[in-house]
UniProtKB/Swiss-Prot annotation:
The lineage of its organism: Bacteria, Bacillati, Bacillota, Bacilli, Bacillales. It comes from Bacillus subtilis (strain 168). InterPro entries: FxsA. This is UPF0716 protein YtzA. Belongs to the UPF0716 (FxsA) family. GO terms for cellular component: plasma membrane.
Length: 127
């Protein structure tokens, strides 16, 4: 329940505050253009990296390897691309962290821990 409160009340309020602050600091037009630009860059980066991960999964499967790492990368890229396309500066920061391979390495253990927790709680079943 606290997570939903943060997601739907606190997070948008912080985003609106950042919009207002930057709108006053650099102006409305640059702020809006920056949001549009991050959405376009996010979509392009997610498409490029997503295609690379797709080929990596195929290659791993051809060699008989489990593509777990590549699938985790793909999930991070997908979520990162979505976050970059959402309007907001915090979501852009989180999305960029998921798209940059160096910082994605920090996020993947959190993703794996969350998935293991979901599996243990029987919320998702991994077979």
């Amino acid at each position: 329940m606290r997570f939903l409160f943060l997601l739907f009340i606190v997070f948008p309020a912080i985003e609106i505050g950042i919009f207002l602050f930057l709108g006053n600091l650099i102006g409305i037009l640059p702020t809006v253009l920056f949001m549009i630009l991050t959405g376009i860059i996010g979509a392009a980066a997610a498409k490029k990296q997503g295609t690379e991960v797709y080929y990596k999964v195929q290659r791993d499967l051809q060699y008989g390897k489990m593509p777990g790492e590549a699938i985790a990368d793909g999930l991070c890229i997908f979520i990162g691309g979505l976050l970059l396309m959402l309007p907001g500066f915090l979501s852009d920061l989180a999305g960029a962290c998921l798209l940059i391979p160096f910082t994605r390495g920090w996020c993947k253990p959190i993703l794996f821990k969350w998935l293991r927790g979901m599996s243990k709680n029987k919320r998702i079943i991994i077979k």
